């Protein structure tokens, strides 16, 4: 049975275990880069869009300066979790296993447990990265908080606004269409990217749709009896439709929650009143530092490059084994001026 826990086998199991679908992570953070070191390096672009100048015949070319690029080196903290495997686990029928139908050997059940535990551990890790994606997009920073660590990676995000008084959506002086057009133009001017995506939760959408000007901009093909026809997507995400006119954006709601391991409280991914105006064409990147571990008994330290690394740990008296999955992720908005966040309620 030990052969299923070799570093090579565990690496293959992790690779073949699918990621749980994630809305913000999958929609925006499409690029992935891994490092052979525990530290990662990334660039943040802020600056004007320059053009090539005219020059007189036979003149030398002027020197182009690299402006607006900030390079940062950072050592991501580890995210890791383990699942225990005891003698009783491989002898007792698993959930969903048919009773009294054939006999499942401990060896076969160990293989089933490996697949099940890997999926659940990876699901937890992917969900935690979805929380990081939300933090980066909605707050312009990654707050790394856990046992023995409380760190903030600030990406110098400045495209944000809080509406006040009667200018808030749903109030008498609200100008929802004008607000969105203004925020889109600000992103376009600063980054060159024209936002094509709006994300909010369902409560914020309800207020937005109370504006007749907004409702009139949605694609008529998605409207029946005056009501929008929604399309379910990843967990908690709904495609509302395409908003035309001067806005030209796909509209999504995202109602998803997570339990914060630091305080045990259930929290929203996208808070009520938050609006994300973004382009899914801009560069948002998932970076992963390397993990250095002792992969098995009698082995030396080994450094692994990749998104995840899994190993088996063993304790004696009482005898128990643990399956541990770990990662060093940091999510980075390379084009930090390409999106805008507003508090609209």
PLM ranges: what are they?
Residues 1-41, 332-345:
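N-terminal alpha-helical "arm" segments
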Residues 26-27, 181-185, 307-308:
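Short alpha-helical segments and helix-capping/turn motifs at coil-helix boundaries
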Residues 31-99:
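Assembly/oligomerization interface modules of large self-assembling protein complexes
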Residues 32-33, 187-192, 197, 312-315, ...:
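A general structural signal for short secondary-structure junctions and capping/turn motifs
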Residues 45, 95, 156-158, 278-279, ...:
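A structural detector for beta-sheet-dominated domains
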Residues 79-156, 179, 186-203, 319-327:
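Long, contiguous amphipathic alpha-helices that act as assembly "spine/axial" helices in icosahedral shell
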Residues 150-227:
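Extended, solvent-exposed, turn-rich assembly/linker loops in the middle of proteins
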Residues 215-345:
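Sequence/fold signature of self-assembling virion shell proteins
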């Amino acid at each position: 049975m030990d052969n299923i826990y070799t570093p090579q086998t565990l690496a293959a199991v992790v690779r073949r275990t699918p990621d749980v679908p994630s809305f913000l992570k999958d929609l925006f953070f499409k690029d992935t880069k891994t490092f052979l070191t525990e530290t990662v390096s990334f660039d943040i672009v802020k600056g004007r869009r320059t053009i090539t100048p005219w020059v007189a015949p036979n003149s030398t070319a002027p020197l182009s300066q690299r402006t607006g690029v900030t390079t940062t080196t950072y050592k991501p903290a580890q995210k890791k979790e383990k699942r225990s495997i005891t003698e009783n686990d491989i002898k007792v029928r698993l959930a969903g296993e048919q009773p009294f139908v054939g006999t499942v050997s401990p060896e076969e059940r160990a293989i089933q447990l490996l697949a099940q535990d890997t999926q659940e551990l990876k699901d937890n890790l992917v969900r935690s990265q979805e929380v990081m994606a939300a933090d980066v997009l909605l707050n312009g920073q990654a707050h790394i908080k856990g046992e023995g660590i409380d760190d903030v990676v600030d990406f110098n995000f400045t495209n944000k606004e809080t509406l006040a008084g009667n200018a808030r959506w749903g109030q008498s002086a609200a100008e929802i269409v004008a607000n969105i057009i203004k925020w889109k133009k600000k992103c376009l001017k600063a980054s060159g990217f024209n936002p094509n995506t709006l994300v909010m939760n369902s409560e914020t959408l309800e207020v937005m749709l109370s504006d007749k000007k907004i409702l009139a901009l949605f694609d008529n093909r998605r409207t029946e009896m005056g009501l929008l026809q929604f399309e379910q997507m990843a967990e908690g995400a709904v495609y509302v439709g395409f908003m035309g006119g001067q806005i030209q954006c796909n509209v999504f709601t995202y109602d998803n929650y997570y339990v914060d391991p630091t305080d045990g409280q259930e929290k929203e991914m996208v808070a009520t009143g938050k609006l994300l105006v973004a382009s899914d064409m801009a560069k948002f990147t998932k970076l992963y530092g390397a993990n250095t571990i002792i992969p098995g008994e009698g082995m030396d330290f080994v450094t692994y490059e990749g998104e995840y690394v899994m190993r088996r740990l063993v304790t004696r008296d009482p005898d128990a084994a643990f399956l541990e999955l770990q990662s060093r992720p940091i999510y980075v908005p390379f084009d930090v001026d390409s999106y805008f966040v507003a508090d609209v309620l």
